[in-house]
């Protein structure tokens, strides 16, 4: 069970990084001129800040520390919105097959993370 948990944490980390990259790719493909460069950097950084600042206190999948404490449902909604934006970003970047694979990996992660989801919903 511990090995599965470590593998899922690696999958989660990979999905988080891929989500940030996908937002940057979307900005690069979708915008021109000055905005192309600014948004390619700003979008992933803004999402990274939201992801790291809003957390549930004592979350076992994180350090347990937080800057802005939120309840579990709010945290779950933030995660799902970020992943949904990443899937949409890939889709609208003309990477439909990649967006489908990414969505399947996100679903797999949340299926494996059923205990964490239960924990979040009870916070």
From Swiss-Prot:
Its main location: membrane. It comes from Bacillus subtilis (strain 168). The gene is yrdB. This is Uncharacterized protein YrdB. It is found in: Cell membrane. Coiled coil: none annotated. The keyword Nucleotide-binding does not apply. GO terms for cellular component: plasma membrane. It is a multi-pass membrane protein.
């Amino acid at each position: 069970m511990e090995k599965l948990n470590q593998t899922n944490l690696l999958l989660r980390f990979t999905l988080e990084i891929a989500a940030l990259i996908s937002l940057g790719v979307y900005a690069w493909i979708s915008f021109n001129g000055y905005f192309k460069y600014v948004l390619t950097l700003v979008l992933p950084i803004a999402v990274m800040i939201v992801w790291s600042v809003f957390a549930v206190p004592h979350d076992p999948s994180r350090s347990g520390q937080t800057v802005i404490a939120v309840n579990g449902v709010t945290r779950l909604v933030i995660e799902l919105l970020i992943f949904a934006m990443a899937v949409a970003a890939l889709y609208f970047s003309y990477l439909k097959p990649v967006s489908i694979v990414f969505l399947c990996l996100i679903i797999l992660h949340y299926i494996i993370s059923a205990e964490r989801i239960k924990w979040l919903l009870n916070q």
